A protein has these predicted regions:
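A short, structured beta-strand/loop element
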Residues: 15-47
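Charge-dense, helix-prone N-terminal extensions
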Residues: 7-13
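C-terminal structural segments of small proteins and small subunits
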Residues: 47-75
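Local beta-strand/beta-hairpin segments that build beta-sheet-rich folds
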Residues: 1-4
């Protein structure tokens, strides 16, 4: 499970056996969400609204880097 970033209590990662579309998993405490990288669509969410909002901001800011790391790992 490659961890891409740890920030503000959030852990941004993907699993070694992922599939398209490119997406990232985010955990904070016991809460988690899954965000598609290209569209920033939330496909699963079990986070508090303020944490989800912050997670989306962080993913948007790091979007290009997360996509690059996805491509490096899976290609």
């Amino acid at each position: 499970m490659p961890t891409l970033l740890m920030l503000e209590g959030f852990k941004f990662f993907f699993y070694a056996n992922e599939h398209e579309p490119k997406h990232i998993h985010v955990m904070k405490g016991g809460d988690f969400t899954k965000i598609e990288l290209q569209s920033l669509a939330v496909t699963h969410n079990y986070m508090k609204p303020k944490d989800l909002k912050r997670a989306l901001e962080i993913v948007k800011y790091n979007q290009a880097e997360f996509e690059r790391k996805w491509d490096e790992y899976f290609n």
